[in-house]
């Protein structure tokens, strides 16, 4: 996967390549799809969610510029694979998943594989995880129509927020926000297609 899919597409960070060579992606894929686990394609994981294709995971991990000991927030745990890659790179990972069943499954898989530096919580990712802010990097694995302000607020100085932005009917763009000492710098990159970032429904009274 690393030599055939990632290096040829420009992924160069050795920490990313080493992490993705080590994390067993097939453990994060439902049984009907395990034979496809190492192909460069997204795969369904249930509840209308997917595990991102390896290149996207590699790109987001590289763009986040993770260093050992970095505190990283992930929005959209999904299968737990992205969190495992970040943990393998030495990050302390806080990950939020809105679907309780996926959060439990991911937490179980991560525990079985020994990733003790990952904390999983079920909840609304739009709000981030303010109790543990600020974060050196924030990785969002589903697409909001606009970047949630709470996530920007929880980014440390010199931190980077990696997020696909756009609607399901119009273009989505992978976007990198950097909080510099002078303010926020935004860079839009290539077009992508992600599932929407969903929110908790308001309580009816």
From Swiss-Prot:
<dbReference type="GO" id="GO:0005737">
    <property type="term" value="C:cytoplasm"/>
</dbReference>
<dbReference type="InterPro" id="IPR000682">
    <property type="entry name" value="PCMT"/>
</dbReference>
<keyword id="KW-0949">S-adenosyl-L-methionine</keyword>
<dbReference type="Pfam" id="PF01135">
    <property type="entry name" value="PCMT"/>
</dbReference>
<dbReference type="GO" id="GO:0032259">
    <property type="term" value="P:methylation"/>
</dbReference>
<dbReference type="GO" id="GO:0004719">
    <property type="term" value="F:protein-L-isoaspartate (D-aspartate) O-methyltransferase activity"/>
</dbReference>
<keyword id="KW-0489">Methyltransferase</keyword>
<comment type="function">
    <text>Catalyzes the methyl esterification of L-isoaspartyl residues in peptides and proteins that result from spontaneous decomposition of normal L-aspartyl and L-asparaginyl residues. It plays a role in the repair and/or degradation of damaged proteins.</text>
</comment>
<comment type="similarity">
    <text>Belongs to the methyltransferase superfamily. L-isoaspartyl/D-aspartyl protein methyltransferase family.</text>
</comment>
<dbReference type="InterPro" id="IPR029063">
    <property type="entry name" value="SAM-dependent_MTases_sf"/>
</dbReference>
<protein>
    <recommendedName>
        <fullName>Protein-L-isoaspartate O-methyltransferase</fullName>
        <ecNumber>2.1.1.77</ecNumber>
    </recommendedName>
</protein>
<keyword id="KW-0808">Transferase</keyword>
<keyword id="KW-0963">Cytoplasm</keyword>
<dbReference type="GO" id="GO:0030091">
    <property type="term" value="P:protein repair"/>
</dbReference>
<feature type="active site">
    <location>
        <position position="52"/>
    </location>
</feature>
<dbReference type="GO" id="GO:0036211">
    <property type="term" value="P:protein modification process"/>
</dbReference>
